[in-house]
Amino acid sequence: MKQAFNQRIRSALNQRKQAGLNRSRRVVSQGNQATLVVDGKSYLNFSGNDYLGLASSKELMEAWQEGLSLYGSGSGASPLVTGYSKPHANLESQLAEWLGFDCAILFNSGFSANQAVLFSLLEKGDTLLQDKLNHASLMEAGMLSPAVMKRFKHNDVGHLKSLLKRSSDEPTLVVTEGVFSMDGDLSPLADIATLTKENDAWLMVDDAHGCGVLGSNGKGCCDVHSITPDILIVTFGKGFGLSGAAVLCNQECGDYLSQFARHHVYSTAMPPAQAHALSHALLMIQQQEWRRDKLKELNQQFESELMNFVGAEKTPTPIKPIIIGEATDAMILADSLKERGLWTTAIRPPTVPVSSARIRVTLSANHSSADISALTQAINELG
C-alpha cells in the first residue's frame, strides 16, 4: 500500500509532462526591479505583480529596516497569544480608515485570507455563488466548505441574478474578484452589489490586483464602482510590494474571524517589522500618484503599439493578456521572447481554459517607455 502514493505521484507527473503542461521553478538571482537575472543572464521582467514598483523602492526598504531595528525579526507567536503588536494594530486601523470599514484583520497571504473567510463563515445549508474565473484559493475553499457552491458565468450579471432567485431562501454569499488576474478585466461590481442587496445576500470582493493600483488614491475597484461590500480582501504582494493580506469587514464580523478563522488563530503573526513596512507602503500608495499615472501611460503605449496584433486584449489594468490558443504555441512564443531578453510567462491549462493559453504580460511603474517598445516590437515580429 505504501507504493500507492509513489505510483499516484509518478502518474500525475507523467500526465502533466505528456500534456506539455509541466511547470518548473527558476532561480532568480536578482529580480525585484524592471529587470531580473536568471542563470547569469539579464531580462526585462514582464511577469511580476509589483505594479507600482514598491518592491524595489529604497524608501520602503528603509522602512522595513527601521521596523527590524524597532521590533526584531519575528512576531514569535500567533495573534491571540503574544504575536499581535503595535505595528499590527496600527496597520489594521490605517487600512480600515482608508477603505471605509470598521476593522481589518491581518493574514499571512491572500490565499489564507480567502480560505479563512469561506471556511469559517459558511455552514451546511448556505449557498455560495462564485464567478467562474475566481482565484484557485476561492474555488478550493468553496468546494471543501459545507455550503452548496454554484458558479456563475464570468461577469454575467444575468446568470448571477437567476442563481440568486433560486437561492432566496438560504443564507447566500456572492464572491467575485475586483480585477481578474489572468484576463486583467474588471468585475461589474456596481451591478453585482445592487443584486446582492436586492436579494438579501452578502458580497465578498477579492481586490488583490486592484488595491493600490486603481481608484482614488489607489483605493481599488470598490472605490471605482462606489460600493462597499460586506467583506473586502486586499493583498500586499502586488500594489504594496511586500506580502500578506487583510480582510476588511464590520466589527462583528471581524470579531467572529478573530475567534473562528483558523488561518488567523493558529498561524504565527506576520513579523511586526513587515507590518511597520506595510504602513509605510500604504502611505506611499496614498501620496505617490505619479506611480499610477506612469502605469496609465505605459498601458496606453502598450495597447497602441499592439493594436493590430490579433489576440492582444485591451484592459484598464497593468495585466495584458495575449491570447495564443494552444499551450505549445504559447510556450514557443514565451521562449522566443526570452531569447531576446524579454521575460514573459506562458499561462496554460489548468490555470486558464483549454485552447486559451496566453502570454500574460504585466506592467510596472519601474518600466520605461523603451522597455515597452522593446517588448511590443518583439511580439509584433514573432507573432
UniProtKB/Swiss-Prot annotation:
What is the recorded name of this protein? 8-amino-7-oxononanoate synthase
The protein's UniProt keywords, in alphabetical order, are:
Biotin biosynthesis, Pyridoxal phosphate, Transferase
Query: Looking at its record, which EC class is this enzyme?
Result: transferase
Q: Which residues bind substrate?
A: 23, 135, 351
Gene Ontology biological-process annotations: biotin biosynthetic process
Extract the Pfam families matched here. Aminotran_1_2 (PF00155)
Q: Which cofactor does it need?
A: pyridoxal 5'-phosphate
Originating species: Aliivibrio fischeri (strain MJ11) (Vibrio fischeri)
Taxonomy, superkingdom: Bacteria
Residues the record lists as N6-(pyridoxal phosphate)lysine modifications: 238
Subunit record text: Homodimer.
